[in-house]
Amino acid sequence: MNIEELPLPSLLRDFLISKRGIRTLYPPQEEAIRAGLLNGENILMVSATASGKTLLAEVAAVNNVLVNDKKSLVAVPLKALAFEKLNDFNTYSELGIRVAASTGDYNSEDKWLGSYDVIITTYEKLDSLLRLKPSWIWNVGQLIIDEIHFINDDERGPIIESIVAKLRMLNLNPQIIGLSATIGNPEELANWLNAKLVKSDWRPVSLREGVYHKGVVTYVNDGEKRISGQGDSLINLTVDTLNDGGQVLVFSSSRQGAVRIARKLAEYICSSPVRYIDPGEAGKLAEEVRETSSSRILAEELTGLIKCGVSFHHAGLELEVRRVIEEGFRRGVLRVLASTTTLAAGVNLPARRVIVNEYRRYEPGYGFIEIPVMEYKQMAGRAGRPGLDPYGEAIIIVSSKDEVDYVIDKYIKSPPEYVKSNFMNPTSLKFHTLSAVASQYAETIDELVKFTSNTFAGFQGKLSAMIQANSVRRMISRIIDELVDYGFIIRNGDKLEATEVGAVVNRMYLDPDTAHVFIMGLRNLNSDADLNAYSLMLVVKSPKIPKVKVRRNELDELAQQAASMWSSIPLKPSDVDELVNYPEDYEDFLSEFKTAMALLEWINESNEDQIMKTYDVQPGDLRVLSDQAEWLIGALQELARTLGLSGNVVNGLRALRYRVKYGVNDELLELVVNLEGVGRVRARALYAAGYRSIEDLAKANVSDLTRIRGIGDKIAGSIIEQAHQLVKDGRVIKFNESTVKGKTRRGGGGLLDHMY
């Protein structure tokens, strides 16, 4: 099918042909068009990576905006993917399409999004918006759910289900387009979505899959190939591809494994007499990584590898560094990338040969377990660059001959696992039950049962039988009892209503169990506690905070340190002596304590390398940790305000939230909060030079500021201009001493005194 044949507005059709160079559709794209994609039909598209799902979603979204004058929502699982989609959709800006991405601030309605046509969010952010119901939500005509196989995920899956259920309860009836490469039961998922299924195995580049053992690749339906070389499997497979002009993507089950692989391959490539890279381009990329990274340690490691045309890639690297590395691989400057499986989750980064280094990974408490088939399919889907590679290869390395046939049958010949709902697990059901009541999607248990029936769980046979047997009603009733006990919901006859506190818990996107723990911690807050340490040790109890692993040789030191800070530890173990003896039960507590200490180092301006050395928290992990902690400290602040705690506590939490966000001491808050382009390093330099307020900077000259290390003419001009405008408009945000010190005295007669 040609683009000229599509029922599209002429300006979109002309744009696709003249600017994007697209004249014909791939077979799966044509099938989706014939199924009614451009006519408002719900579509579930399950097709291989690089088969055109992304382009089709873009065309459908832009068409919806131009033809129907409606907004299009694009929901993705990861922040990194949201910004990749933002870049993709921004190419349509010359058609007048306004595109925005929103991934954080769960308690904000984001009214500003009303000015945009295509809105890209994470699943969580979209669910939070549907709780708040901003006015623009009523003009949504389309929902695109990217990577919809995440419905199988324990945490994100129920959120996808909640989004669909809420849209149905609002009677918005937007067109729903689900996209995935790997679903074992797409018919069932399509039926739940009331969607037409477009399923295709077609690929623009053929895929050869095989298993490697002792120098031989056994392909499925394609015989065997002997790989020349001595000894190491990874080196042999990598060099075989490089000699043929291809790139290699190696997947490892762990970060340490990815780093080890990158080191080994870089050493071989750099010592090889064969020239595989352009040294000049590799040097430029290495320098860009050095300038982007906040960690000198990681920058040194990466630049050495990149100069050999190799890099590693995992979530411990900052997002900005990962983007530089990804772009270097796309441009062919990097020939080999060693990554954890997180790279397979949606980021568009294909290679000639994909190598799966191991099909088992270590899970604490379980030992080594086999990866899911779906995960392998996601990795294998990265093989083959359309327009660049004549074929793609996905090869799994095994250590014994007996594994060859087993792995072929298990991973290559088998379909991915069925996706299933996780909505009915107690934690998820409690979270979404409070949401349904507090956001007025349901006011009775009957309506909650109806809400649940709109989820994927409600569609699947097991839950249907449970509804008929009234067991779902009993589950929901028990959860309501618990939410009433927590003080989040009240009963008024058959009617259910969120309390003021319950409404805050819902608006802040807290799960009820975590909110209950927070309230208990606020109740126990006393004047002896250091508010910052106490609050950080309270929020790290949330399951949303990734915990720092404790090594056995750290237990004694951490236990002693915790004992020395006993008055600032909320909801602590009952006996200091028991803690010092660190029985097994206390290891989780010490992990929380270590995590809080890492955050304390961050807000006290320790540099990223020092935090990484002391706490084994890499820069990317630190960003995630600070992002999550900022959100949870903000939630704690709102709870403290609602519960009637003193203004000093509320203001202290407000200051702490910003300190966690920016990683600064309290004296720098005014600079980092008010000024764009001024982070912790630049703010400290300004402060040390005597510029301690916005008013000081408003009086400065460019020549004064450029004497400060790290500040050039452009940055200096921007800082002064911002400061002038803020002072002129009276918009300077101030943090006085009582605000930042955050005394812990509780207010009297507040809601907290009546809840427990």
Curated annotation (Swiss-Prot):
**EC primary class:** isomerase
What reaction is this protein's catalytic activity? Couples ATP hydrolysis with the unwinding of duplex DNA by translocating in the 3'-5' direction; ATP + H2O = ADP + phosphate + H(+)
Boundaries of every Helicase C-terminal domain copy: 233-435
Q: What is its EC number?
A: 5.6.2.4
Binding of ATP, residues = Q29, S47, A48, T49, A50, S51, G52, K53, T54
Pfam families per the record? DEAD (PF00270), Helicase_C (PF00271), Helicase_dom4_arc (PF21280), HHH_5 (PF14520)
* The keyword DNA damage belongs to this UniProt entry's keyword annotation: yes
Q: Which GO terms describe its molecular function?
A: 3'-5' DNA helicase activity; ATP binding; ATP hydrolysis activity; DNA binding
Q: Does the keyword Metal-binding apply?
A: no
Task: List the keywords (alphabetical).
Answer: ATP-binding, DNA damage, DNA repair, DNA-binding, Helicase, Hydrolase, Isomerase, Nucleotide-binding
**CDD domains linked:** DEXHc_archSki2 (cd18028), SF2_C_Ski2 (cd18795)
List the ranges annotated as motif DEAH box. Answer: 146-149
Give an example GO biological process. Answer: DNA repair
Q: How does it assemble?
A: Monomer.
Q: Which HAMAP family match?
A: Helicase_Hel308
- Role: DNA-dependent ATPase and 3'-5' DNA helicase that may be involved in repair of stalled replication forks.
- What is the name listed in the Swiss-Prot or TrEMBL entry for this protein? ATP-dependent DNA helicase Hel308
Q: Write the lineage as a comma-separated list.
A: Archaea, Thermoproteota, Thermoprotei, Thermoproteales, Thermoproteaceae
